[in-house]
Structures are given as C-alpha cells and as structure tokens.
Amino acid sequence: MIELVIVSRLLEYPDAALVQHQQELFDALASSENLDKEDAQKLGVFLRDLLARDLLDAQADYSQLFDRGRATSLLLFEHVHGESRDRGQAMVDLMGQYEQHGLQLDSRELPDHLPLYLEYLAQLPKEEALGGLQDIAPILALLGARLQQRESSYAVLFDLLVKLANASVDSQKVAEKIADEADRKSTRLNSSHP
C-alpha cells in the first residue's frame, strides 16, 4: 500500500531529502488506488504546505510536537505500555516480526516508531497491512484527536490512517479522553498558582 509509505515519509523528521524527493511523493500519491479523491487532495495539500515552509521552522515544529512529551509521541508502545517492562518484550516481539519479513533495522531505530511500522505494513499484502493498521487504530485516533486539539496540520495524516484501516473507533470515547486530559491539565495549572 503506497499510501502507507507516503504517510510514513511525512511522519518522519522533515529534512532535505523530503524536499529532494518531493516529486516521487507526489507521483506516488497520484498512483494511489486506496484513497478517494478528497483524501488524496488533503494529503497533497499537507505535502505542499509542508514543503512550502522554511525547513528549520518545520523541523522545530516537528520536534516540539512529536519529540517532547508522551501525548503525541510517535512511539506506539509509549501509548500502550508506558515505561513498564512489557514495553521491552513488545519491542523484541515486533523486531521479530520485522525480521521475518526481511526488514533490517538501523541500530538507532526503535521498532515501535510509527513511520517504521507503516513502512513495514506497506511491504505486507493489503489485507495483512489493513489488519496491522486496525490493531493500532485506537492509538491513531487518539493521536489524531490530540493533534487536532493542538491545531496541528499533522492531524490529517492520522485521520487518513484511521480511515484506511476501516476500523470502528469509538470517537465519543476518544473525545472524552481528550476532554479529561484537558481538564486535568487545567486543574494542575490552576492549583500551581496560589
């Protein structure tokens, strides 16, 4: 599924290679068979807007959004296991899956990094890839909602992934979780000021 490769690349740290290979991304988007016209257009707009930004500004915003704090971390197991011991075993298991399909990791890459997981899914037959997306759909929906709350354009990528997964995510539960997080944050801020 070429769409997973495109979204994977757009969820990586923006760099000069993104600018250098932009035409390949637009060509891949044009060849998509799994996106309707509206979704392909949204993805194209996101890509154009990202490329139009100053690279250093895009990098700073990316780091602020995805590298600081757990709420919008692109490390999938962060949202499932937190800092528990189960996270380590889950990573070992995922690395085993990658190796079974011939994917070799760079020693600096964590196996639960969403762009890497999407690259892995893109190599699988469509039904297996969709199953893998469905497995993480609740995390994707939660991340998308948190990004919408922050008014980030990256939210469109998560909405698209949930739609591609064709998963039934309880949007009411996601909204309640986001509202609860906002309430707790507000309470902490108010209690820290005498």
Model-assigned labels for residue ranges:
Residues I2-L56:
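A structured, charge-rich N-terminal accessory region that forms the first stable segment of a protein
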Residues I2-Y13, F77-E78, L116-Y120, L160-K163:
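Short, hydrophobic/amphipathic alpha-helical patches that form generic packing surfaces
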Residues I6, E24-L25, K42-F46, L75, ...:
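A general alpha-helix detector
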Residues H21-F26, A141-G144, Q148-K173:
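Helix-rich interaction surfaces within compact, conserved domain-sized segments
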Residues A40-R108:
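A glycine-rich, hydrophobic loop/mini-helix early in the fold
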Residues H81-R150:
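Conserved helix-adjacent loop modules within structured domains
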Residues Q172-E181:
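Extended amphipathic alpha-helical segments with heptad-repeat/coiled-coil character used for oligomerization
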Residues T187-S192:
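Conserved small/polar residues in nucleotide/adenosyl-binding loops
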